[in-house]
Regions:
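Serine-hydrolase catalytic machinery in alpha/beta-hydrolase-like enzymes
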Residues: 2-108
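Active-site signature of alpha/beta-hydrolase-fold catalytic machinery across serine-
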Residues: 36, 125-126
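Short helix-capping and hinge/turn segments at secondary-structure transitions, especially at repeat
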Residues: 99, 103, 119, 127-128
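Residue in the alpha/beta-hydrolase core beta-strand immediately N-terminal to the catalytic nucleophile
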Residues: 110-112
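Gly/Ala-rich beta-loop-alpha elbow adjacent to hydrolase catalytic centers
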Residues: 114-119, 123
Length: 128
């Protein structure tokens, strides 16, 4: 299993727990960006997990080090516009969080992966 990412978690406030949401932020953001949205969802029986992307250089941004799920090299149509290695590594990290939720007793069909921007791309990649 891949090493678990650092996460901000909001535990369910009622029992039984009915599911979990693993919600990834966008490029340059933090794990807590979408935490303020949770109360508006009215899902007290759900655990929310907000993983933090590792900090790494992003070529598109002049090599600036920032929270990033994967390197973006260019916006042009190119077979190497993103780092496939970074995407695979991140996918394994998210899959490890999914496995942890299953070990916590959450059925796989009650685990939702979501994300915004770069985090949304990773959510889609993992889901496929």
């Amino acid at each position: 299993m891949s090493e678990l990412l650092s996460c901000f978690e909001i535990e369910p406030t009622v029992t039984p727990q009915l599911g979990s949401v693993i919600w990834m932020h966008g490029l340059g953001a933090t794990s807590q960006d979408f935490v303020p949205v949770v109360p508006y969802l009215h899902l007290p029986e759900v655990r929310f997990i907000f993983p933090q992307a590792p900090e790494s250089p992003v070529a598109l941004n002049g090599g600036m080090i920032m929270p990033s799920w994967y390197d973006i090299r260019t916006l042009s149509e190119s077979p190497n516009r993103e780092s496939e290695e970074d995407i695979r590594k991140t996918a394994l990290s998210i899959e490890a969080l999914i496995e942890r939720e299953k070990q916590r007793g959450v059925p796989a069909n009650k685990i939702i992966i979501a994300g915004f921007s770069q985090g949304g791309a990773i959510a889609m990649h993992v889901a496929l």
